[in-house]
Amino acid sequence: SGSCEVKTCWWAQPDFRAIGDYLKDKYDSASEMVVEKHRESRGWVETLRAKYALFKPPTERDLVYYENSPNFCEPNPETGSFGTRDRMCNVTSHGIDGCDLLCCGRGHNTRTEKRKEKCHCIL
């Protein structure tokens, strides 16, 4: 009588929240770059260089950018953004739906509604 052993190995995807937190950290610490053009024997070559020399240069695993994000507060047909003016916001939220962020420093109006409705209750 013989015995067999089966060994199975697989890669598991990390927790979605962990991935989001990791990407947010990378985004928050992204390095701004500038494009430099210089001539070499094979023609013009473009390279990226850190915009601010006082910061350490980014590694291969760091996130870099060379264009600023568009302003999503104001309407912009080029980017397809409708802006945030007249949008509903959540006064108690500190997230992306919060008035502080969504209103882009323009302030906000608070509206209180009082409704009287029949509840069709049977007692």
Curated annotation (Swiss-Prot):
GO molecular function: cytokine activity; frizzled binding
Residues where lipid is bound covalently (O-palmitoleoyl serine): 1
UniProt entry tagged with the keyword Nucleotide-binding: no
Glycosylation positions in this chain: 90
GO cellular component: extracellular space
Family according to the record: Belongs to the Wnt family.
Protein's UniProt name: Protein Wnt-3a
Organism of provenance: Pituophis melanoleucus
